[in-house]
């Protein structure tokens, strides 16, 4: 059996403001910084150590990982950053307040954009100032790969391809791996690992800054999973 740890970034500044974030590169809030520290403390106290780490190219996930590893005295381990672990791209919704958007388009439509597997939000245009394909951190993305909007299915395709090509071989080789990413990229990986249906994934939520531990067999099939609960600082099994 091997263990895999997934952690959604700590609370971000736009989580506080209730905005659609997507690929917008906002930082952690003060609470998010504390969540990342607590995650590191809990993981270390629970006996976890890591050989390798993966994260996105968005600072809220990278900073969460750095702080977590610092608390564990593991800042020296290899860290691989990839856009394929970025949050789902929310297209033209990025930056908009979720409540205001619901008032404009209706709760049902916004819920479809947020929770369904195959309904994309309105797309960005390439002349929009929020379109960041020219940023150096995206120099490895081909023009046709850079999203203007995504649904969860799109997100799952890129996350699972990176999992299969880069992460899974290391997990299978016995490496202790931590992935610091985002709500929807973790949902996408959880959907893949647990073979969750398109309908059931709509009800899956990933809390900020709380380590999610997967126990996997030699074929990387889940045996079980649980959260490390920051409130009681002990292992507590919870439904994902």
UniProtKB/Swiss-Prot annotation:
Q: In which pathway does it act?
A: Carbohydrate degradation; glycolysis; pyruvate from D-glyceraldehyde 3-phosphate: step 3/5
Which CDD domains does this UniProt record tie to the protein? HP_PGM_like
Residues the entry annotates as binding substrate = 8-15, 21-22, 60, 87-90, 98, 114-115, 183-184
Sorted alphabetically, the keyword list is: Gluconeogenesis, Glycolysis, Isomerase
Q: Name one GO biological process term.
A: gluconeogenesis
Q: Which Gene3D superfamilies match?
A: Phosphoglycerate mutase-like
Instruction: Note the superkingdom of the native organism.
Output: Bacteria
Record: active site: 9, 87
Q: Which GO terms describe its molecular function?
A: phosphoglycerate mutase activity
Catalysed reaction(s) here are: (2R)-2-phosphoglycerate = (2R)-3-phosphoglycerate
Q: Look up keyword Isomerase and say if it applies.
A: yes
What function does the entry list? Catalyzes the interconversion of 2-phosphoglycerate and 3-phosphoglycerate.
Could you tell me what this protein is called?
A: 2,3-bisphosphoglycerate-dependent phosphoglycerate mutase 2
Q: Which species is this UniProt entry from? A: Bacillus cereus (strain ATCC 10987 / NRS 248)
């Amino acid at each position: 059996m091997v263990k895999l740890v997934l952690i959604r970034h700590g609370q971000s500044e736009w989580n506080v403001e209730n905005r659609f974030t997507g690929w917008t590169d906002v930082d952690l809030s003060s609470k998010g910084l504390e969540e990342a520290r607590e995650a590191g403390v809990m993981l270390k106290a629970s006996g976890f150590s890591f050989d390798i780490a993966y994260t996105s190219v968005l600072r809220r996930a990278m900073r969460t990982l750095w702080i977590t590893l610092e608390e564990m005295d593991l800042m020296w381990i290899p860290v691989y950053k990839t856009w394929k672990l970025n949050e789902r791209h929310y297209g033209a919704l990025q930056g908009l307040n979720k409540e205001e958007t619901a008032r404009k388009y209706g709760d049902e439509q916004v819920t479809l954009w947020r929770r369904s597997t195959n309904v994309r939000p309105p797309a960005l245009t390439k002349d929009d100032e929020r379109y960041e394909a020219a940023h150096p951190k995206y120099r490895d993305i081909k023009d046709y790969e850079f999203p203007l909007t995504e649904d969860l299915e799109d997100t799952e395709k890129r996350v699972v391809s990176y999992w299969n090509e880069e992460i899974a071989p290391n997990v299978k080789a016995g490496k202790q791996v931590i992935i610091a990413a985002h709500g929807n990229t973790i949902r996408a990986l959880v959907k893949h690992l647990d073979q969750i249906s398109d309908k059931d994934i709509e009800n899956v939520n990933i809390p900020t800054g709380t380590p999610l531990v997967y126990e996997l067999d030699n074929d990387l099939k889940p045996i079980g999973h649980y959260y490390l609960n920051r409130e009681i600082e002990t292992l507590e099994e919870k439904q994902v």
